[in-house]
Amino acid sequence: MSEHQGRVIVITGGETGIGRAAVLRLAAEGAIMVIGGILEEEGAATVKAVRDSGGRAEFHRTDVRKTDQVDALVDGAVRDHGRIDGLICSAAVFDGFASGIDTTDALWDHILDVNARGTFLACRAALRHMVPAGRGRIVNVASIGGLVGMADGASYTASKHAVVGLTKHLGCFYAKEGVTVNAICPGAIETNVRANSQRLLGADAPPMAGVGADPDWVKRAVPMQRKGQPDEMTGIISFLLGEGASYVTGQCFTADGGWTAK
């Protein structure tokens, strides 16, 4: 039996990309997955995939920028299932590699609101239950853009640095309460993040250009000479949610094919 059997795990942004891959893996390992996101069609498809495989999952439309909606997602999971064992913050939008000069006020606000504020709101909502319970695992999906300065655009880089900083603070501050907070920092992963970000950003969306528009950039930047797949991120996430990571907190785990090791 998997150690995640019967555990209640809330995830934001679990309908696509790395989040979806995490949902599918953890549900297969027996976790009850409570998904919050705003892409309803993709959310429904993810829930169906889990249930068709015999797992348990549910989707709740949640805008992570909205305190009341995030609180409702987490509080609802506790109300319906009796507890929350884990939280994964995966909701994010991308800035299309927009430079500082090319970053509008609206783009900056939108990226920071989703990526940084959204992560904070979900962590806070979960901690309100985890701290009194004396246990809990939080995994934030950051990025190598939160560790270095030239992997992404200005607003995305700033937002992911914020996620890394928040992870370190919360991981240290709540360690004595039995709650661990860690992050995964993926590199270039094969997802629909650009198309989804254009949909989510709407009028605030910039051209999705930059380094990613060059088909050969991966060979130059990544020692493995390929992009990663979403399911290659899920092993670290599963580990950080488990008992094997009981002495790990405030840490950021890089999975980037060697990009930042050069």
Spans of model-derived segments:
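C-terminal substrate-recognition "lid" of short-chain dehydrogenase/reductases
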Residues: E3, F120-C123, V131, R135, ...
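Conserved glycine-rich cofactor-binding loop
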Residues: G13-T16, L39
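Short, small/polar-rich loop/turn modules that mediate ligand/substrate recognition or access, typified
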Residues: I88, A175, T180, V248-G250
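Substrate-binding pocket helix/loop in short-chain dehydrogenase/reductase
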Residues: A98-G100, T104-L112, I138, V218
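Active-site helix of classical SDR
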Residues: C123, S159, T167
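Alpha-helical segment proximal to the catalytic Tyr-Lys
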Residues: R128, C172-K176, S246
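Residue(s) in the substrate-gating loop at a strand-loop-helix junction
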Residues: S143
